[in-house]
A protein has these predicted regions:
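Active-site-proximal cap/loop segments of hydrolase catalytic domains
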Residues: 1-177
């Protein structure tokens, strides 16, 4: 029982792992995932473009190798989804534009894929909205946990935010040392 989750570029890594290795994961969560590298280059500026076109990365611009940029963009790989997936995005995210994630969502729908998603509308916190130490973010994390638990079937699932927060903040207890 292995699930995978990540946010931002980690969300992109989550998606690409689910698409390329579907039998390795029971489920996945992608939070504010980088979803379309080509679209992203259009709004992130020349520094971001320089990272991708550098010889140690892709080594070419999208104009020189659009196929490679599509291969590395989850929105262009949507047909590969076989694993239960939850996606979150936020319309006021200044890092990963929600239109990029909406492209992924529309691509998954066009492929007839079964998945869950939520587009948060101007939720406080922008890019980090569900990772902040606030009651609203804790409630969102509990929803993410419940989605994952549905497939991972933990022996003692959390019943509420209080239990989730207790586990998150409980000091590690070393035994046998």
């Amino acid at each position: 029982r292995v699930g995978i989750m990540g946010w931002s570029h980690g969300g992109m890594i989550t998606l690409m792992n689910l698409f390329d290795h579907p039998k390795d994961y029971v489920c996945g969560f992608a939070g504010v995932p980088v979803s379309d590298v080509i679209a992203r280059l259009g709004y992130k500026g020349p520094e971001y473009m320089a990272l991708f076109s550098a010889p140690y990365h892709i080594g070419k611009t999208p104009e020189e190798d659009v196929a490679e940029y599509r291969r590395r963009s989850p929105a262009w790989q949507a047909a590969k989804l076989q694993t239960p997936l939850l996606i979150h995005t936020n319309t006021n995210d200044a890092d990963v534009n929600s239109l990029e994630v909406e492209h992924l969502i529309q691509a998954l729908k066009a492929e007839g894929k079964s998945f869950e998603y939520k587009i948060f509308d101007n939720h406080p916190g922008g890019h980090s909205f569900d990772r902040m130490d606030m009651p609203q973010a804790s409630a969102i994390r509990l929803d993410i946990y419940r989605f994952l638990a549905k497939y991972l079937k933990p022996p003692k699932p959390f019943k509420n935010v209080k239990e989730l927060r207790k586990a998150a903040y409980e000091p590690w207890k070393l035994t046998g040392h």
